[in-house]
């Protein structure tokens, strides 16, 4: 029998307690540790969120991502309003932690059917946004083709994966002073590029989402590989598109 003193009424701690390694409350800390080793979530930046069974599980804001524990995870009922923040339906909210500033942007991905959304501060993502701006101006998008790793990125919902000769296009939006203020631009980019699974944020990082946790993770890895490769290709004077 559970000791009720361990879980005060209304805390809903049972939502983040599971022996299943695939449970979102266990997956998010593991993913954040992995992303930290890759330099994607340095200095408390970035975030990860998973949608499952009418709930949204989100890593907290302003914490060292490699040290997150299951009990640090916020849980929202889904669907839930993006704005105002006070209208969001938190059913588990750790008292000493702050909700993720990425929340409305993650919700934008979930509203389009994603099962997982990842935000990183990858240096390679930042660098390609600057290179695109210099070469194409602020309205340019990142484009690359004839690279094998492109096969790790979907063509669009239910359209299969990109091929070697296909051109990958990732929209770029301008950064804002506050994370939540990116939401409108992110949603506009999603509308203009309905097949995209990622949006770059200039001088900031990238948002990536996928139908499942595994797909979001592998797509994020593939994109970061392509961004790093693109930076190195640029150094050698090699074109991204043939």
UniProtKB/Swiss-Prot annotation:
Its cofactor is Zn(2+). It holds the Pfam family Aldolase_II. GO terms for cellular component: cytoplasm. Pathway: Amino-acid biosynthesis; L-methionine biosynthesis via salvage pathway; L-methionine from S-methyl-5-thio-alpha-D-ribose 1-phosphate: step 2/6. One of its GO terms (molecular function) is methylthioribulose 1-phosphate dehydratase activity. Gene3D superfamilies: Class II aldolase/adducin N-terminal domain. InterPro entries: Aldolase_II/adducin_N (IPR001303), Aldolase_II/adducin_N_sf (IPR036409), MethylthioRu-1-P_deHdtase_MtnB (IPR017714), Salvage_MtnB_euk (IPR027514). Its main location: cytoplasm. Its EC number is 4.2.1.109. Substrate binds at residue 102. It is found in: Cytoplasm. Keywords: Amino-acid biosynthesis, Cytoplasm, Lyase, Metal-binding, Methionine biosynthesis, Zinc. Zn(2+) binds at residues 119, 121, 204. NCBIfam families: salvage_mtnB. Catalyzes the dehydration of methylthioribulose-1-phosphate (MTRu-1-P) into 2,3-diketo-5-methylthiopentyl-1-phosphate (DK-MTP-1-P). Belongs to the aldolase class II family. MtnB subfamily. This is Methylthioribulose-1-phosphate dehydratase. It comes from Uncinocarpus reesii (strain UAMH 1704). The gene is MDE1.
């Amino acid at each position: 029998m559970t000791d009720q003193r361990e879980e005060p009424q209304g805390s809903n701690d049972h939502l983040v307690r599971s022996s299943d390694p695939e449970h979102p409350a266990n997956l998010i800390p593991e993913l954040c540790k992995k992303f930290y080793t890759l330099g994607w979530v340095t200095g408390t930046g970035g975030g990860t969120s998973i949608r499952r069974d009418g709930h949204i599980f989100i890593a907290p804001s302003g914490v060292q991502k490699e040290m997150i524990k299951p009990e640090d995870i916020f849980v929202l009922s889904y669907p839930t309003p993006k704005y105002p923040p006070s209208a969001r339906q938190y059913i588990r909210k750790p008292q000493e932690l702050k909700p993720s500033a990425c929340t409305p942007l993650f919700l934008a991905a979930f509203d389009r059917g994603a099962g997982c959304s990842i935000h990183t501060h990858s240096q390679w993502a930042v660098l390609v946004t600057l290179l695109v701006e210099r070469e194409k101006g602020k309205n340019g998008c990142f484009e690359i083709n004839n690279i094998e790793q492109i096969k790790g990125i979907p063509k669009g919902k239910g359209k299969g994966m990109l091929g070697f000769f296909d051109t990958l296009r990732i929209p770029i939006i301008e950064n804002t002073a506050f994370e939540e203020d990116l939401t409108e631009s992110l949603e506009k980019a999603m509308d203009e590029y309905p097949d995209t699974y990622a949006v770059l944020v200039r001088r900031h990082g990238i948002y990536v989402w996928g139908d499942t946790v595994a797909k979001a993770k592998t797509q994020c890895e593939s994109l970061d590989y392509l961004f790093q490769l693109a930076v190195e290709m640029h150094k050698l004077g090699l074109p991204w598109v043939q």
